[in-house]
């Protein structure tokens, strides 16, 4: 496996690849959810590149960029064991050669980025677009793999590729859950035993909503009320039913509905969702 730290070495490596390339962008602290993206890329492509880069532009003023976990050696070992061909782990100066005021400004589309996560974390998706577009230019992948757990991010990346006419297939990957049904997240390590039990209300609420939909319930207000009752002991940022343009829905639209939840357990903020 190649461990690449500079754009020059990545470009040289990329030029040597003649067949399909799968790309898995990450911020490190890899877990089984990331591993499932890697495994799918390995299955569908001749070569797989993983990036490990904690992107400063997607952190807000009140979010502790310096505290984000960076177990790079552990991440490299996981990638090598999985069969990844190359890992790109650049320093900030490689990805952002100019200071902020000299940088080209890129903005995520407002209709997808200003609600839900974008309302809570203002400017977050602008930072995501900044780094993902740079990584796409550098890796020039055939396919890029994103988890469905970060549903709003996935929709924004899909729109980015379509709007900028990029020849990249975006491959959405299913949510991976732990044995207790909690969606895997790098943030889960911040939960103590008591908080972990409390956090299980999130998948339970979504499961209850799915069961109601399966029984024929289509009214979004009723479904949200059902979920919020289960989440009553958590600090809920939002529980919403939206279509794939993130427009609020009054009734469920088959194959075009997302039920999105964000809630805080102690100091840890967790996301989960249903694709209906």
Swiss-Prot record:
Give the stretches traversing the membrane.
none
- Which amino acids does the record list as binding (R)-pantoate? 58, 153
InterPro entries listed in its UniProt record: Cyt_trans-like (IPR004821), Pantoate_ligase (IPR003721), Pantoate_ligase_C (IPR042176), Rossmann-like_a/b/a_fold (IPR014729)
Enzyme Commission code: 6.3.2.1
- Per UniProt, ATP binds at 27-34, 147-150, 176, 184-187
For the protein in the UniProt heading, the enzyme class is ligase
The record's GO CC annotations read: cytosol
- Family recorded in the similarity comment: Belongs to the pantothenate synthetase family.
Assembly? Homodimer.
The protein's name is Pantothenate synthetase
Give the originating organism.
Answer: Helicobacter pylori (strain J99 / ATCC 700824)
């Amino acid at each position: 496996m190649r461990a690449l730290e500079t754009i020059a070495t990545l470009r040289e490596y990329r030029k040597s690849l003649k067949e399909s390339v799968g790309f898995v962008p990450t911020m490190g602290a890899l877990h089984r959810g990331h591993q499932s993206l890697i495994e799918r890329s390995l299955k569908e492509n001749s070569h797989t590149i993983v990036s490990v880069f904690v992107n400063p532009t997607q952190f807000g003023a009140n979010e502790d960029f310096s505290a984000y976990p960076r177990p790079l050696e552990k991440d490299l070992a996981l990638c090598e064991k999985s069969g990844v061909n190359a890992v790109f782990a650049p320093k900030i100066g490689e990805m952002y050669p100019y200071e902020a005021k000299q940088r080209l400004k890129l903005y995520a589309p407002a209709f997808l980025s200003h609600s839900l996560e974008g309302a809570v974390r203002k400017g977050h998706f602008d930072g995501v677009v900044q780094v993902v577009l740079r990584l796409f230019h550098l890796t020039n992948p055939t396919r890029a793999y994103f988890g469905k757990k970060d549903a709003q991010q996935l929709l924004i990346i899909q729109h980015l590729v379509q709007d900028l006419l990029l020849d990249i297939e975006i491959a959405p990957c299913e949510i991976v859950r732990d044995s207790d049904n909690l969606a895997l997240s790098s943030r889960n390590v911040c939960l103590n035993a008591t908080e972990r039990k409390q956090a299980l209300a999130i998948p339970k609420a979504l499961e209850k909503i799915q069961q109601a939909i399966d029984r024929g319930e289509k009214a979004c207000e009723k479904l949200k009320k059902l979920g919020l009752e289960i989440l009553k002991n958590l600090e809920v940022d939002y529980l919403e039913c939206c279509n794939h343009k993130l427009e609020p829905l009054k009734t469920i639209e088959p194959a075009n509905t997302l039920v999105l939840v964000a809630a805080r357990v102690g100091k840890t903020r967790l996301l989960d969702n249903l694709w209906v």
